[in-house]
Amino acid sequence: MNDAARRIQRVYLTLTLGNTIAASFIWGINTLFLLDAGLSNLEAFAANAFFTAGMVLFEVPTGVVADGWGRRVSFLLGTITLAASTYLYYVMWQISAPFWMWAVVSVLLGLGFTFFSGAVEAWLVDALRFSGYEGGLETVLGRGQMVQGVAMLLGSVAGGVIAQATNLGVPFLLRVLVLVAMFAVALWLMHDVGFSPERSTHPLEATRAVLAASIDNGLKNPPVRYVMLAAPFSAGVGIYVFYALQPYLLDLFGDPHAYSIAGLAAAIVAGSQVLGGWLAPLARRLFHKRTSVLILGSVVGAVILLVLGFTRVFWIALVLLALWAVVGSAATPVRQAYVNDLIPSKQRATVLSFDSLMGSSGGVVVQPLLGRGADLYGYPASLAMAGVIEIIAVPFLIASRRQSASADRSTSTPAGTDQQGPAKDEWQPGPAA
């Protein structure tokens, strides 16, 4: 890796570190926070579903911002939107706001996150290629995931401990402060490199054009299409499980106010993410095809969730949680690399946002569905149901594998891609949340 690529990597890791610390202050306590505000299980997960619906609604428009105005602008808008909507969450908790207010602000939170989804990853990939980096993207993205895991570990443990020492609202205020700081950091360090925004005076036309391009390079590209069709099941389950584990583990532990235990659960996921990021390049070398890693990860993850559904021992549940997180974390950089190697630079942010949209759309349905299941049958049963839903993703991943795309075997960064993956004359195999 040359000096220019190292600088790009350092900026990427810095942004990842700060943003993840900000987000993870509340990850371990978010569901408990909503329940403490007076929401039922169904309402709490419905609020999360409205957050996800916001991501679905704004993925393409914010992708237009990233591709038309620059990834840096998109990132800055994301930090401000998230800071403002997080503060509104704190205010609503204080006044025990009605559900409709939680729904509205949750949509705004979703808007904030869509400014990030696709934009940072697209910025990284284009900047690395511009710098002359020819290595595999799994390595850089794996490091990003390790940094994300460390940040999540620090933030989630701190959030849980601070909540127990003070109250459930303080971690939300800390998140606002860190996001404001990240705005300043990004303003100073993040600049679009290797990418020239194409601005349009007609935003609606730009949205339609970019949406069409994302469909052409996404859903109309068979290897990408099947991975995207798997996303609603795997991503929807992942979102639900992460937040359901908080009250589930507190119930097993026997103390509904042991918020540090909820932070511990998020910390275990974070530590597993570090390990998973480290294992990603190794997992890639162990298998001839990237899709083999994805298929195995989905099957093993589903089995673990089914077992969690029948577990009544706290410490066994923690071990299973760690295994589930490691498996998912090891597969994530491989999936990123696979998808990035199949899409062209100009539409990269939008196609990645569209991919995120597909996953979010599953969360809109899966979260309230499983939340209602938790109300009726308990959290263990809802986790078992989540395992069944996860299995549905496997046939789509198998279908993607059958397309025999060059990116499925790729191990280094490609110079360019057409709709089907390879560059027109030469394809230098390459990789890429």
Residue spans of the language-model regions?
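Juxtamembrane intracellular "pre-TM" segments in multi-pass secondary transporters
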Residues: 1-6, 191-229, 418-421, 425-432
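Helix-loop boundary and gating motifs at the non-cytosolic
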Residues: 2-57, 223-269
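C-terminal transmembrane bundle of multi-pass solute transporters/carriers
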Residues: 10, 45-47, 57, 239, ...
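Hydrophobic core of transmembrane alpha-helices in multi-pass small-molecule transporters
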Residues: 17, 85, 96-116, 316-330
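C-terminal ends and interior cores of transmembrane alpha-helices
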Residues: 76, 80-96, 102, 299-312
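Cytoplasmic helix-loop-helix junction between adjacent transmembrane helices
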Residues: 105-149
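Helix-loop junctions on the cytosolic side of multi-pass membrane transporters
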Residues: 168, 175, 180-203, 398-409
